[in-house]
Amino acid sequence: MAIQVLQTPLFARQKKKLNKKQIKFLDKAVNLIIENPKVGEQKKGNLNSIWVYKFKITDQLYLLAYEWDKKSRVLIALGVHENFYRNLKKYLK
């Protein structure tokens, strides 16, 4: 069964800002999420349907927010920790 990977417009905009080397790290993180969606941490409160996977790109911690079910993975947002959750809440309203 093939798993469908979808991107939100916010994620696509944030991915465009990365260089090729950073995109390779991102692709590894996305592949991990496809194989095992529980690799991230499920958020609580207002963001209880969101999972966040944390990974490093050249000594900088990045967060990748996503939702998942058996058939798909929806990549919602990508960024550094600064204002990440505030911007995520604003986007999801």
Labelled PLM ranges:
Residues 20, 31, 35, 90-93:
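Short, intrinsically disordered, mixed-charge
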Residues 12, 51-53, 70:
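Short alpha-helical segments used as structural interaction elements across diverse proteins
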Residues 1-29:
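Arg/Lys-rich, positively charged N-terminal/basic patches that mediate binding to nucleic acids
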